[in-house]
Amino acid sequence: MHLTRLNIERVRNLKTVALHGLQPFNVFYGANGSGKTSILEAIHLLATGRSFRTHIPKNYIQYEADDAIVFAQSATEKIGMQKLASGEQLMKVNGDTVATQGQLAKLLPLQHIDPQSTEIIDHGAKPRRQLLDWLMFHVEPEFYFAWQYYSRALKQRNTLLKTRRNLSLADLEPWNKMLSNYGEILHSQRLSIVEQWNVYFQNDLSQLLPDLEIELEYSPGFHTEQGLMQDLLNQHQKDIERRYTEYGPHRADLRLKTLFGHADDVLSRGQKKLLIIALKLSQIAMLHASNKETVVLLDDLTAELDLTAQQRLIERLSQLGSQVFMTTLDRASVKKHLHDLSISYQLFSVESGQVSLAAP
């Protein structure tokens, strides 16, 4: 879904934003603190139901306002989100209220590329697992169903472990069965997708880091040779002592291995940034191969990447048919890249929360 229209109300310092005629590349420039990143934040809120800067709605809803609203339109769809300061939200697709955020996310596959962040590599398994599951959600039709049932069983089992001290295997049996059943399904799905993803990843890695050999290695979170049920049975007493479930797909990881060790241990900060970009580009490529359009948020392109990396990234996103919303302090460099690559774009000036169309 590519956006032709975007409306934003009461997000941070932004005045009422009404953008029309959006292009494949949409560039927002202005001083620090002008509100550039808040535009990306609003699009992220629409697609995911949350900000990438804070978990607290009051922090991005304007002072003394009760809500924030983001609306977008494509050639075929209209989607909208009202986020209340309480955290509640109202979502609509083509005028009809929808019950889950997943319905918006399916329509608006969204990748956020922040060249300044190395969180996916440096901050443990969770962000890597989330990266993998973003791809799963968009390319594996049965994943969301299996994950919902697995998560429900995990929550119930953990509640028992936390609230009851004299648990028997019989008490845990119904949740063990459900966890084992859906956990094995999730493992099989993830394993298959990682194998496919690795092909796309190697292609983008060779363009950004041609001198490095890195493999995606999926760690399932349990001992696959004996199965998840056996792990749950063997560990039930320790789980009672820990008061949570140790083994299962919720503990999975996506390891990035080089010839010299794990990426987080051996790569420089600059290499880590390019590696993360390669991971996300390869996911976009996999969706593109399935005829799915991705919207990409690219924050502060020129801050951390050299000119060659900037141009390679812009060119690759254009090849993949992505619609890009990017921020920059250096509009001259970005304009040159876009002109050199003959890419259609729209330029917007952002000043004290006011967004206006600028001359290309």
UniProtKB/Swiss-Prot annotation:
One of this protein's Pfam families, by short name? SMC_N
Q: Does the keyword Iron apply?
A: no
Q: Report the GO molecular function annotations.
A: ATP binding; single-stranded DNA binding
- Tell me the SUPFAM superfamilies matching this sequence: P-loop containing nucleoside triphosphate hydrolases
UniProt: ATP binding residues: G30, A31, N32, G33, S34, G35, K36, T37
Q: Domain of life of the organism in this record?
A: Bacteria
Q: Where in the cell is it found?
A: Cytoplasm
Q: Name one GO biological process term.
A: DNA replication
Q: Which cysteines are joined by disulfide bonds?
A: none
Q: Which Gene3D superfamilies match?
A: P-loop containing nucleotide triphosphate hydrolases, RecF/RecN/SMC, N-terminal domain
Q: What keywords is this UniProt entry annotated with?
A: ATP-binding, Cytoplasm, DNA damage, DNA repair, DNA replication, DNA-binding, Nucleotide-binding, SOS response
The family note in this entry says: Belongs to the RecF family.
PANTHER family in UniProt: DNA REPLICATION AND REPAIR PROTEIN RECF (PTHR32182:SF0)
Q: Which HAMAP family match?
A: RecF
Q: What does this protein do?
A: The RecF protein is involved in DNA metabolism; it is required for DNA replication and normal SOS inducibility. RecF binds preferentially to single-stranded, linear DNA. It also seems to bind ATP.
Q: What is this protein called?
A: DNA replication and repair protein RecF
Query: What species does this protein belong to?
Result: Acinetobacter baumannii (strain SDF)
Q: What is the lineage of its organism?
A: Bacteria, Pseudomonadati, Pseudomonadota, Gammaproteobacteria, Moraxellales
